[in-house]
Amino acid sequence: LGVLFTGSSIGGIVLPIALTHLINEVGFGWSMRICAFIILFLLILANLTIRPYRPPQQTQKVTWAQLGKPFRETQFILIVIGFFLFSYGFFAVVNYLPVQAVSTGMNSNLVQYIVPILNAGSLFGRLFSGFLGDKLGRYNIFIVVCYLSGIWILALWLPDTSTAALIAFSALFGFFSGAYVSLITPLLIQISPMAEIGFRTGIVLFLISLGGLTTNPVNGAIIDSSAGWSGLKIFSGVLCLAGTSFVLVARIRQTGWKVLARF
């Protein structure tokens, strides 16, 4: 899955740069259409060429009782809360880092590369976190690198707004937060019955999307308040740490206080 998720990182590197040049050449409207046609073509190509690893089996219809079952499991609830909180901090960085770079006076030609730099770091982070997760335990790797993601926000992005610091932060945060993207599904699979992985994944991604949907207005309100950019950064960093802590509690419930347990 780590290898699979690098595809979106590659898109996150190429598309922002291409889109900037397209807007200058053909305007915003046709730039959006061109991107939409590219994505449509790639989706059609994937649907025509991908084959299931196992043949589809006859399955029973999922009932409301089955959909509610995961919410009676403490482990599931803990990781859902953790993912949801982390998404608030994660998307605050992704969406507002370029805006803050502009506000500090960074060269406009350099600002357009902030998100591609973050996604380039994320590409390698997704690969390494997936590989190390298989070797050392997926929960272990997720917890370590996501704690470090929150620490980078508070230790680097919060105190320093120089161009060099913002570029370094975008690369470091991208690398360490890559585990959040690539390990969501593996963490869920590890605590779920095989027959329920499909709809459980849908539930988790739906709930995470609520965080991604609401984080922008919340963060915008923080910036407009007296807290300003510092408030946004503290909010983002604390929620990344809090979200990771819920996943840590889920891990402790499973393994106890065995630090070296592979889980």
PLM-predicted stretches and their roles:
Residues 21-37, 218-242, 262:
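A membrane-interface helix-boundary motif in multi-pass transporters
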Residues 73-131, 135-139, 185, 215-219:
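Extracytoplasmic gate region of multi-pass secondary transporters
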Residues 14-27, 101-102, 132-136, 214-227:
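Interfacial helix-cap and linker-helix signal at transmembrane-aqueous boundaries
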Residues 3-54:
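Helix-loop-helix hairpin linking two adjacent transmembrane segments in secondary transporters
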Residues 1, 179-193:
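Intracellular juxtamembrane helix-capping segments at the cytosolic ends
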